Amino acid sequence: MEPSKVYYTDFRCPVGTSLLEKLRRVCIAAGIKDIDMDGRFVAIKMHFGELGNLAFLRPNYAKVVADLCKEQGGMPFLTDCNTLYPGSRKNALEHLSCAQLNGFWPMTTGCQVIIGDGLRGTDEVEVPVPNGEYCKTAKIGRAIMDADVFISLTHFKGHESTGFGGALKNIGMGCGSRAGKMEQHAAGKPAVQEGLCRGCHRCAKECGSDAITYNAENKAGIDYDKCKGCGRCIGACSFDAIYSPNDCANELLDRKMAEYAAAVCHDRPCFHVSLVQDISPNCDCHCENDAPILPDIGIFASFDPVALDQACVDACLNAAPLPNSQLGANLAKPGWNCYHDNFKDSNPNIEWKATLDQAEKVGMGTRQYVLKKV
């Protein structure tokens, strides 16, 4: 496979030129206007940030991308899917409120916000995974798969489970329904925290395997001989009583995530933009954000999300760590076993290369790229 083109600009702005204009230039240089969007629905997949977190991308960036789509006759909408865990984004009502409180609504972004997997995180489509090794199908939010064109707009950062959070994570994990997220994150089957169960029986009604029973105290329990591990009961519960107890090894998570991303992008026009700024050590899913581990680097865009992530990773690995950060503090510890890898030195119990390896393996793109400065 030939190296892919990745377009890049830094964050330096001469007088009279804003970062929003630089983002627009990078998108155009990378070929966003080559996509036929006329009369088509365009899903712009991004992360709206957990309440309390301030590292997520500003709504102004989303408006630049949405405006470019509308200029080409497209009908864009911002989207993300509900979270597997408790928080402010576990159902569509709370998720929309969170997005609005963080600044994402039509007056600021120029388009609507649609939660991709519906009210409870159960509105999903089972999509074939091309060349899937770990997942033969992926459970993806229906609204995302209904779109004619797919664009990822990613805040590139560190991550406590996957090493870094880039385009592949934004697409693969982010587009998964709650059941899809569980399939990626967990070894299999959910569990019940009895103290939170209200005995409403909603989970039993949602279960297609007749795997949920109730004890004498009217608390739910799961028959693991019948349970298929689909995760739909998690979405059905309004009280966070059903949860995923068993995280897989990080490498398996990384590889499943890459395959989910391949399912989302297969056989339709896709474009990818990543902003490498406010590089926090952990995910924007936290209700806080620690100090950036690296200085702001730039804006990257490409048709190839694998090459895009690799280019962003390389830029981060070549950047100087910031002293007042998780990374800087680790490196300053006496006797620290330095990995000479800014992601592993920030979160030493992770391995980030598997995501890129698996995405390349299933034919989503190539890790080889040519960087073109805009």
Stretches found by the model and what they are:
Residues 2-61, 71-80, 85-374:
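Extended, low-polarity segments enriched in aliphatic/aromatic residues
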Residues 66-67:
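Terminal amphipathic helices with adjacent charged low-complexity linkers/tails
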